[in-house]
């Protein structure tokens, strides 16, 4: 494809959110064009033409709850408690649970989640049998878990919901739009919840 020599010597944490910096928009657009051209050249590009999802089964199949907040986690002792508590504090007109898939954390995350799950009946702490799942494998495990709800809603282990009605709004959007996926926005903050401008 191409070779790029790294000239940015900042630590990774300092450049973590460069992708949302408006000053980098031109580079992002250029990279998107390059990737699109490559996919077209190798016959792997998919035209953005999508059929409406088949929702005839919605509401027919039995689920243990309406929604599950899915949190994949690995070694996030500093942030996962806030994420879990944010999910557990949602106010909804439907039953929901929180499924945390702990990918064999070694920093105390596992013990913390075990403690939290003893105090919260709707918190399901899953440690997979396999050690090599990664974030996608953890997501897949949660989506196929017997306690997963009709709607699986992502929350990263270092994120919190912006308010107690966020989950309700997401499920309302699923229902009203009869869609297979809902994508929202987020606000970057520091650990004191102060917004970080792009």
Could you tell me what each predicted segment is?
Residues 152:
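Short aromatic/hydrophobic "clamp" motif used to bind/position activated sugar donors
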Residues 129-147:
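Glycine-rich, basic loop-to-helix element that forms the pyrophosphate-binding segment
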Residues 86, 102-111, 131:
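A conserved acidic beta->alpha catalytic loop
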Residues 71-82, 104:
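Active-site beta-to-alpha loop of glycosyltransferases that engages the nucleotide-sugar donor
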Residues 164-197:
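Conserved donor NDP-sugar-binding/catalytic core segment of glycosyltransferases
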Residues 85-95:
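Short, acidic, metal-binding catalytic loop of nucleotide-sugar glycosyltransferases
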Residues 2-66:
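Non-catalytic membrane-proximal stalk/linker segments that position and tether the catalytic domains
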Residues 95-104, 127-129, 156:
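Short beta-strand/loop segment that forms part of the nucleotide-sugar
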